[in-house]
């Protein structure tokens, strides 16, 4: 719960210092599950000292208390995001990414699966509004990754996919990403494919390799925002003429570039301590 509480405070602070959406991954909370497990195990050992309790029974007690902690932690994220208001008077536009493939080892993957399961279960239930009716909250938005160990009956994490599908049928979340297609389509200059969350609600960053490390970077990556081309409007404006379509398309692209440059120039000369959580502590960059 403390890790989840701090996560929601960071979410609120970041949202209050910008207008766009933001994304977090449950993988970044997974390491704290084992921290809680060890703390609870120490408490149980102290409580059971001198009693004739088997190691198996102690493990059962630890896991039950751990599940209860995870339940409270996930509930903290869901309810705080719904009830928090940013300084802009809005709920934070937050996306929660659920990708088992991000886990660094088998234990972390199993712990991540517990968090994902609890997150989906709570979203399926919904939250109560002022009238006490269970409703579907707009945020956090959920994204679930389909991968090799959760798409076939009999796969170790297939139960999560079944739970996600049940939740989608009722709550219209989570959305889904195919790991297989992402690895095919999002290939960096090193020739490696990557699966990662979108930036906020919908915009996917292009593959990028940090020149300082030679490694891909997607989290905490400075991005000034997105400009969208309305292709339907371009098509209608062309009147069915292909040459005119491409001419208008090129003009709109140039306008997009101008819009992005306007944002860039607006930020030139701004000291990083104008919004430390964004520029100095990693929400967007780690500048000095």
Predicted regions and their residues:
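Conserved catalytic cores of very large enzyme subunits
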Residues: 1-288
């Amino acid at each position: 719960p403390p890790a989840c509480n701090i996560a929601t405070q960071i979410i609120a602070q970041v949202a209050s210092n910008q207008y766009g959406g933001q994304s977090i991954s449950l993988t970044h909370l997974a390491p704290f599950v084992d921290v809680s497990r060890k703390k609870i195990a120490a408490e149980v050992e102290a409580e059971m000292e001198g009693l004739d309790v088997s190691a198996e029974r102690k493990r059962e007690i630890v896991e039950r208390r751990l599940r209860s902690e995870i339940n409270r932690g996930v509930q903290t994220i869901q309810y705080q995001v719904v009830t928090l208001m940013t300084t802009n008077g809005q709920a934070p536009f937050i996306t929660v990414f659920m990708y088992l493939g991000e886990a660094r080892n088998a234990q972390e993957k199993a712990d991540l699966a517990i968090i994902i399961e609890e997150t989906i279960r709570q979203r399926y239930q919904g939250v109560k509004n002022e009238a006490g009716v269970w409703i579907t909250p707009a945020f956090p938005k959920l994204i679930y990754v389909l991968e090799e160990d959760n798409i076939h009956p009999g796969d170790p994490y297939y139960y999560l996919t079944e739970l996600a599908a049940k939740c989608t049928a009722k709550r219209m979340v989570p959305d889904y990403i195919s790991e297989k297609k992402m690895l095919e389509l999002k290939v960096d200059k090193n020739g490696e494919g990557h699966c990662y969350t979108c930036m906020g609600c919908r915009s996917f960053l292009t593959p990028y390799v940090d020149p300082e490390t030679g490694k891909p970077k997607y989290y905490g990556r400075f991005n000034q925002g997105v400009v969208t081309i309305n292709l339907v409007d371009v098509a209608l404006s062309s009147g069915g003429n292909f040459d005119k379509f491409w001419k208008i398309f090129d003009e709109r692209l140039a306008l997009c570039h101008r819009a992005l440059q306007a944002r860039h120039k607006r930020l030139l000369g701004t000291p990083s301590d104008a919004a430390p959580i964004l520029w100095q502590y990693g929400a967007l960059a780690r500048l000095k």
